[in-house]
């Protein structure tokens, strides 16, 4: 199919369905510059391997195979993949411009430096406070199969229109840390993971692009939680919240275990807002949005942080 396509460097076959393929001749043979092949759930490497003509599937091609977390082991153990010695990694598509997101996958990783891309830190949700409207994040050092997480990505200086591919998360699987998991480990967790796309549960909370968890309408039938991601369920009052439960209309922000906020709300000892300041003279050089990011061109009518206070820009 792609025999001797010398100019190919990356190939997206995430929507390719191999179920009806009856013959496959030297699929990626002599694609010498091909570095990455992205495969979807309906791309069966083992199925193609059973076709006699697939014997040269990866001849003279050293591309890394990126597959969905659910099909990782099937792809890794494919006879042709083993024979060719292809590297295999799971990948998850994400919103490339969001600083925070959620992740829940059926395979594990020890997250050794240099073994993962698309995020820089991983957290578990360990508590929620109804009165403060916050959830607490505790840093995780590895990916445990089936456990839901919040990830952070350092995006300062990223050129989203350039060659930087920030639209996927990928990592090396640690076989020793990956048990056989067929369902998320949601028992006792405020953050609930899902391996498949699902309609968001009414009354739950979804992490949105502003870095906060927003409530889902009780009668929701359209808003979805994506595959290999997670949502916040505060229906139980056993952890935080008190006897009165949680306010379903409230937006919940994230704070780290040490009390530091992920957003703009830095609090002084006297309870006043410190805001985000230039460390040289404690004066802001520019406007900041509500996530603490510098804004080069403030928009009229939008809310920003100036001198530690929220203001509406009216110029």
Label for each model-derived stretch:
Residues 1-3, 22-29, 52-58:
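Consensus positions within tandem repeat domains that build extended binding/scaffold surfaces
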Residues 6-22, 31-50, 62-73:
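Structural signature of tandem-repeat unit edges
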Residues 40-42, 66-72, 106-107, 154, ...:
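Structural motif
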Residues 59-91:
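Extracellular/surface-exposed low-complexity segments
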Residues 84-116, 137-212, 216-264:
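A short, polar beta-strand/turn micro-motif
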Residues 126-127, 260-315:
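C-terminal outer-membrane/trafficking sorting elements
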Residues 127-137:
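Short linear interaction motifs
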């Amino acid at each position: 199919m792609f025999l001797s396509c010398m100019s190919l460097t990356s190939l997206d076959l995430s929507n390719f369905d191999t179920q009806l393929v009856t013959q496959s001749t030297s699929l990626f043979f002599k694609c010498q510059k091909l570095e990455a092949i992205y495969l979807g759930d309906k791309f069966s490497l083992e199925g193609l391997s059973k076709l006699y003509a697939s014997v040269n599937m990866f001849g003279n091609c050293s591309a890394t195979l990126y597959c969905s977390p659910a099909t990782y082991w099937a792809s890794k153990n494919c006879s042709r993949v083993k024979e060719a010695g292809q590297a295999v990694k799971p990948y998850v598509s994400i919103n490339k411009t969001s600083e925070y997101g959620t992740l829940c996958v059926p395979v594990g990783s020890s997250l050794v430096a240099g073994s993962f891309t698309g995020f820089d830190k991983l957290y578990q949700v360990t508590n929620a406070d109804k009165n403060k409207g916050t959830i607490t994040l505790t840093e995780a050092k590895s990916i445990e199969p089936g456990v839901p997480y919040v990830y952070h990505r350092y995006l300062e200086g990223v050129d989203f229109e350039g060659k930087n591919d920030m639209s996927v998360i990928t990592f090396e699987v640690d076989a020793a840390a990956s048990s056989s998991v067929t369902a998320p480990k949601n028992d006792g967790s405020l953050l609930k993971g899902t391996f498949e796309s699902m309609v968001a549960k009414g009354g739950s909370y979804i992490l949105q692009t502003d870095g906060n968890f927003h409530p889902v309408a009780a009668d929701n039938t359209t808003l979805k939680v994506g595959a290999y991601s997670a949502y916040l369920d505060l229906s139980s009052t056993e952890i935080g919240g008190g006897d009165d439960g949680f306010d379903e209309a409230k937006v919940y922000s994230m704070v780290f275990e040490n009390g530091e906020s992920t957003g703009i709300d830095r609090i002084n000892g006297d309870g006043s807002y410190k805001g985000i300041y230039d460390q040289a003279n404690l004066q802001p050089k520019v406007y900041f949005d509500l996530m603490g990011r510098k804004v080069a061109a403030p928009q009229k009518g939008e809310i920003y942080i100036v001198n530690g206070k929220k203001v509406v820009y009216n110029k």
